[in-house]
């Protein structure tokens, strides 16, 4: 082998060049709250058994792909546990938990079933359902603009640290929807984000340009004929 070959620089993880980070975003596995149609928001709920199985399946899939430089995650238990399973499978020791990746704060809607929220907290539910992006949810809840700013800003920071590298990020349904909207703002399609689904972004660490390559990919669940009982695929259950 020539000296040049021995010291060859590996190609960047992103097909768009060394300025871009390939950011693989995974929604956490299922929780009992998802299964029961409970609005979780920033409630700290663990995975249920189905969610743990989903996390193992997505981890198994990601372990067969290019090794990530790091795994980042929301610090909420359902995301952190999913991230830990992925990091272990991918043999990655660099696991970073950060509240910037948390789900949308749902204010007065926290802990309510969707059907009950419409009746018991009509003002909060109306605010949640509003298409006005600056509309905050009563009880300290975030607006969509606030959610987007928090999540997008942190992914830009991650991309700046990992130019030319691949990283995995574990987050939540509504947060991931906002990331997709930021990358593709002209689309009117509401994207379905099932539990442990994969979205792939290429993000320039210099210019902040985003490219959405893939969203809502659950091929790892289909291969094992695993039931996709993933309420909140629209981001609603968080």
Regions found by a protein language model. Give the residues of each.
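Loop-to-helix element that buttresses phosphate recognition and phosphoryl-transfer chemistry
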Residues: 25-81, 86, 137-152
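Domain-level recognition of soluble alpha/beta enzyme cores
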Residues: 186-211
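Glycine-rich phosphate-binding loop signature in dinucleotide/nucleotide-binding domains
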Residues: 64-67, 158-165
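Residue-level preference for the first positions of well-ordered beta-strands
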Residues: 23, 164-170
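Eukaryotic N-terminal low-complexity, Ser/Thr- and Lys/Arg-rich leader segments
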Residues: 1-20, 221-238
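Phosphate-handling substructures
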Residues: 88-152, 211-217, 223-238
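Short glycine-enriched, charge-decorated loop/helix-capping segments at active-site entrances
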Residues: 38-46, 112-114, 186-188, 229
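Phosphate-coordination/substrate-recognition cap region in phosphate-metabolizing enzymes
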Residues: 2-18, 56-126, 194, 209
